[in-house]
A protein has these predicted regions:
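Ferredoxin-like alpha/beta domains used as RNA- or RNAP-binding modules
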Residues: 1-106, 133-207
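Short, well-ordered loop/turn sites that connect or cap secondary structure elements
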Residues: 118-119, 138
């Protein structure tokens, strides 16, 4: 049965992001115009909004992309502030290192939402041990694989075939034949291809 992706498209449109960021193809959403908001358009819109509204929307955008609720998101921010470097960069890097996001980035599933379900259902191992916590933070050297008893599930084969041309971030390595991924480095901000202005989130929480 086809999935109803209209709510996703509407939410994306409201936040000014393309459904492709969420892993959805434009063709799957009739309510998406196909136009990606550029920075000039964003700047014009920002002038029409209050500073608070603009900052709040940016936070909502990141929460929506990664599927994180407010309490957990605040926890990531508080930790980001304590870490060396830019708080905004640290915030995104923590979110990027979530196991469900890594499963998505490796192409095991087309969306973060579906990848989170797969992790919750215990289909993945990290360094040979089953991990069913979507927020689990991966580190360099860790190996992420489909659990042996889950490898025969047709969904995984279909997903990997559909995502054969999926671009793997340079901080990850993937062996499609063996269905195994490896974290080779901590992601840098420039490795995170998301249309977000994280400094606005820092400004929001700094008030």
């Amino acid at each position: 049965m086809a999935k109803n992706r209209e709510p996703i498209a509407k939410h994306c449109k409201a936040l000014g992001i393309s459904p492709a960021v969420m892993g959805y193809n434009h063709d799957n959403s009739r309510s998406w115009s196909g136009k990606v908001t550029n920075r000039n358009a964003q700047a014009q819109t920002r002038r029409k909004k209050s500073e608070y509204a603009t900052q709040l929307q940016e936070k909502q955008k990141v929460k929506f992309i990664y599927g994180v609720l407010e309490k957990q998101f605040l926890g990531y921010y508080e930790k980001a502030v304590r870490m060396p470097g830019k708080a905004g960069d640290n915030l995104l890097i923590q979110l990027e290192r979530r196991l469900d996001n890594v499963v998505f980035r490796l192409g095991f599933d087309a969306t973060r939402r579906e990848a989170r379900q797969l992790v919750n259902h215990g289909h993945f191992t990290v360094n040979g041990r089953k991990v069913n916590i979507p927020s689990y933070q991966v580190k360099p050297g860790m190996v992420i694989a489909i659990k042996e008893s889950s490898r025969s599930i047709e969904r995984f084969k279909a997903n990997l075939e559909a995502n054969a041309y999926h671009v793997i971030p340079k901080w990850l390595d993937f062996d499609a034949n063996n269905m195994v991924g490896k974290v080779v480095a901590v992601p840098a901000r420039e490795d995170i291809d998301l249309p977000v202005e994280e400094h606005l989130i820092v400004e929001l929480y700094s008030k």
